[in-house]
Amino acid sequence: MALRFPRFSQGLAQDPTTRRIWFGIATAHDFESHDDITEERLYQNIFASHFGQLAIIFLWTSGNLFHVAWQGNFESWVQDPLHVRPIAHAIWDPHFGQPAVEAFTRGGALGPVNIAYSGVYQWWYTIGLRTNEDLYTGALFLLFLSAISLIAGWLHLQPKWKPSVSWFKNAESRLNHHLSGLFGVSSLAWTGHLVHVAIPGSRGEYVRWNNFLDVLPYPQGLGPLFTGQWNLYAQNPDSSSHLFGTSQGAGTAILTLLGGFHPQTQSLWLTDIAHHHLAIAFLFLVAGHMYRTNFGIGHSMKDLLEAHTPPGGRLGRGHKGLYDTINNSIHFQLGLALASLGVITSLVAQHMYSLPAYAFIAQDFTTQAALYTHHQYIAGFIMTGAFAHGAIFFIRDYNPEQNEDNVLARMLDHKEAIKSHLSWVSLFLGFHTLGLYVHNDVMLAFGTPEKQILIEPIFAQWIQSAHGKTSYGFDVLLSSTNGPAFNAGRSIWLPGWLNAVNENSNSLFLTIGPGDFLVHHAIALGLHTTTLILVKGALDARGSKLMPDKKDFGYSFPCDGPGRGGTCDISAWDAFYLAVFWMLNTIGWVTFYWHWKHITLWQGNVSQFNESSTYLMGWLRDYLWLNSSQLINGYNPFGMNSLSVWAWMFLFGHLVWATGFMFLISWRGYWQELIETLAWAHERTPLANLIRWRDKPVALSIVQARLVGLAHFSVGYIFTYAAFLIASTSGKFG
């Protein structure tokens, strides 16, 4: 018999029902569960797939450059970044009538186009790209890298080039390589690009390969470096009247510590950014020489971890046994990587708007809103994934004998205390925050707004003041003009920083009040509840009082049959599944808060947020309802406009979201009966019954239906908000 899908599981391949297809797709990437898998093949498969992943990323970024060069308006945007709308790509749609063609022909284009809200124009402009030819060159280079990655992935699957398991488990060499080789060298290379190409570009000097060796980025070249006069590189920075991309008001400094923002572009000084990357490069190049490899010097990871025992002896054996536990568990390593990456992605969302690095991006409001929302949602998914793989580690890889009384074992021993603390924190935050909101709602409804309970966030205001914000009247640290902290930084970065913190036209340290206090605690509720569900799922993954043998059932099981009541819904996968809903809910509150506060800031009516955000009706009426008017107006009696695509996507997003409930609420029996009815009708319908199937159609399993429901819920939820966000922001600010 010919091999049927899935080849990696002969047991599944012989399943006579459609379960074969869905289970095959579901377990395609779970290499550990495949037939004849060895540890060596497992590591090699994952290693090769990383190259495939890189190839896809390079292809995607190449596509961005290529389409903007081919169909965009980069060169005209460069001439006037604040008034020309950047084009992502053309739209070819046979359904477009004349009104649609007119509505979507924008940004100086000849036909219908999509506007770019990704910030790539600002990014490319900042790093020194100026012409379509530059973009094509970049696209071709990335295409070349993509091909190289594919070849490398294929190569490392060939017998002669397959790395051994010992190579994959050489933690010190990998750390040194990643720290020095990837972070250190790439940061140094990026500093080089900024100094040699981007900074001259910002001063009207066009540097390419043909004049790369002729243009000195600094008049004295490397002289100050070798004579120890490094401070010369910071002298004569760009002036506050500098026009970006021209020599007007330009200086000669390349590595500065000015602080604050370039007055015209409203972004960080490019010379500050170069200095930052040089410092990072230095730190990581040093860090990558700390671990012992072939030369017998430096730290051994195992020794470091074994030495980490708490003093006094009352807190167990610390990190003993962790080295082998982590080094032999791919899920533990992935969990750590995802946890770190998730936090970093959320920090990127925060810093991209508060400390914008790209020229003119701060004045492109829709792009700012889109990038913040995009990175926060991605951070949410990555962080929940960290806990999922933590739970899989506990089920598949955790060895109690190896970890006796160390931090992992003690986490499991104290899980009741950990869960109950998270529980009371969530209950406290939930009831108090909702109580305050609802009280304020009732006061507004009864016409006595002065009876609201409004709490000033004085601790947060004090922290902002300590960083130099003077409007609250706290005379402390950097907001006090006669303190040592103020005097120490006065001659370098401080004036620029203080100017930025106290200027109300940017997003650095926004003024906060009672509305912020409430929504901050609502978000804290969401974060703690999500964490509670995820932590409980991981800590109970091996077993609980209710089901002590849970680990024998694997990561995702629906129930243990009718014989053991109450075993449904308690697999580690179920915890992940429930947590994703809470995660989406939380990121929803985060993005609503960010967007509403910024809309009022950009429109100059901050009082609307301050007055309406203290009660729930204010959020529903003055944020959601008021700002969805543009969406509902995409089609009107006068025809259509450029928001109609978002209006359609808003409706379509709701449809996808609602479809999720169809899978989440009804279970297998209903679908099985429906499928059998459909199969009966199919077999009795002329022409249709010429099409036969080999697999008996069966309903999705409980776990699969939940996954499909969750996927629709998540995609619909994000689609709906994306359309709302982009339409309401671009509708107001063009």
UniProtKB/Swiss-Prot annotation:
Membrane-spanning segments: 46-69, 135-158, 175-199, 273-291, 330-353, 369-395, 417-439, 517-535, 575-596, 643-665, 707-727
Catalytic activity: reduced [plastocyanin] + hnu + oxidized [2Fe-2S]-[ferredoxin] = oxidized [plastocyanin] + reduced [2Fe-2S]-[ferredoxin]
Residues the entry annotates as binding [4Fe-4S] cluster: 559, 568
Pfam family, one: PsaA_PsaB
Cofactor note as given: P700 is a chlorophyll a/chlorophyll a' dimer, A0 is one or more chlorophyll a, A1 is one or both phylloquinones and FX is a shared 4Fe-4S iron-sulfur center.
Biological process terms in GO annotation: photosynthesis
Binding residues for chlorophyll a B1: 654
Annotated localization: Plastid, Chloroplast thylakoid membrane
InterPro entries listed in its UniProt record: PSI_PsaA/B, PSI_PsaA/B_CS, PSI_PsaA/B_sf, PSI_PsaB
Cellular compartments per GO CC: chloroplast thylakoid membrane; photosystem I
EC number(s) from the headed UniProt entry: 1.97.1.12
Keywords: 4Fe-4S, Chlorophyll, Chloroplast, Chromophore, Electron transport, Iron, Iron-sulfur, Magnesium, Membrane, Metal-binding, Oxidoreductase, Photosynthesis, Photosystem I, Plastid, Thylakoid, Transmembrane, Transmembrane helix, Transport
Family named by the database record: Belongs to the PsaA/PsaB family.
Record protein name field: Photosystem I P700 chlorophyll a apoprotein A2
Species name: Drimys granadensis
Gene designation: psaB
